[in-house]
Amino acid sequence: MTNQPTEIAIVGGGMVGGALALGLAQHGFAVTVIEHAEPAPFVADSQPDVRISAISAASVSLLKGLGVWDAVQAMRCHPYRRLETWEWETAHVVFDAAELKLPLLGYMVENTVLQQALWQALEAHPKVTLRVPGSLIALHRHDDLQELELKGGEVIRAKLVIGADGANSQVRQMAGIGVHAWQYAQSCMLISVQCENDPGDSTWQQFTPDGPRAFLPLFDNWASLVWYDSPARIRQLQNMNMAQLQAEIAKHFPSRLGYVTPLAAGAFPLTRRHALQYVQPGLALVGDAAHTIHPLAGQGVNLGYRDVDALIDVLVNARSYGEAWASYPVLKRYQMRRMADNFIMQSGMDLFYAGFSNNLPPLRFMRNLGLMAAERAGVLKRQALKYALGL
């Protein structure tokens, strides 16, 4: 059994954990990242990853600050400048970058592209140690240090352990941190399609009685479709071949989609989780390990990047003032900054989900009236967009 000391151990080196590790290393912390496997290498002429993230303007700024955005753009991403949502054709809400005098709202980025860009930067940084493949099997606290036991017998001792290991976080579970959680009565299917026409720079979402249908433009003539429906219906779609799925898309997506050819699909259930606490002495949770959200507005990874920004700021400031930066009072500052914001965003998505998953005629009328009012709200609409973009 080997015993390796480090300042900070991060379990999970994905989009959020990788960004956090890089940011902390750039501020001089010695960081060890524990990850099951390296991200898949980027292949330039491959079809897109089914998993797509809508990266907001604020998240792009964070990634630029970390020095990885050029690598993302050198692989591939696609800007979007307009976001539109509606149920009735007479009740559209349109958010446009021009309203905020911005060049764009954000970028559509494949998860594997973002992971690869971050991983390359982590491999090159002298303050980062990568443990891959690495699997956490036990976590204990001794003498103000966290001891992480890995499969194979290696023990890593760290002042601070950070769980960035996703919705089913082992760090959270091993720390005994509970969650508020429930399953939505919906599942989600992601479908990579080739479009007959240029997908453009607008992303849109139509609410239907069965669940939303969304369109995310990608590079070249590629796009991603998002189909929300009952778990039984999504299972039915999963069992179809691509020709059958193409026919279902034509029936159930709005005509503005045009002719598309599906080439890959994946599905997952929708669950809401919120950790009862984000921190303990020498321990913190970030991203999906702390909170998951209905993907309706594409805010999941952006909330994770807000966590990253806040935690880096708290730790760097505490160290600069000579404080015990891994102590509970310091880490509690991070929780105070992020927990309420994440709860507000979760609750907003829950309100949308509840409001648009009921088909009583009076409620349908009221919610479409609400969309019409939102479109005409002017300053309020712009403030809502700025909040969603993290500006």
Swiss-Prot record:
One Pfam family from the record: FAD_binding_3
Keyword annotations of the record: Cytoplasm, FAD, Flavoprotein, Monooxygenase, Oxidoreductase, Ubiquinone biosynthesis
Gene3D superfamilies: FAD/NAD(P)-binding domain
PROSITE patterns recorded: UBIH (PS01304)
Enzyme Commission designation: 1.14.99.60
Gene Ontology BP annotations: ubiquinone biosynthetic process
Xref: InterPro entries: FAD-bd (IPR002938), FAD/NAD-bd_sf (IPR036188), Ubi_Hdrlase_CS (IPR018168), UbiH/COQ6 (IPR010971), UbiH/COQ6_monooxygenase (IPR051205)
Protein's pathway: Cofactor biosynthesis; ubiquinone biosynthesis
Listed cofactors: FAD
Oligomeric form and interacting partners: Component of the Ubi complex metabolon, which regroups five ubiquinone biosynthesis proteins (UbiE, UbiF, UbiG, UbiH and UbiI) and two accessory factors (UbiK and the lipid-binding protein UbiJ).
Protein purpose: Catalyzes the hydroxylation of 2-octaprenyl-3-methyl-6-methoxy-1,4-benzoquinol during ubiquinone biosynthesis.
Protein name stated in the entry: 3-demethoxyubiquinol 3-hydroxylase
Provenance organism: Escherichia coli (strain K12)
Lineage: Bacteria, Pseudomonadati, Pseudomonadota, Gammaproteobacteria, Enterobacterales
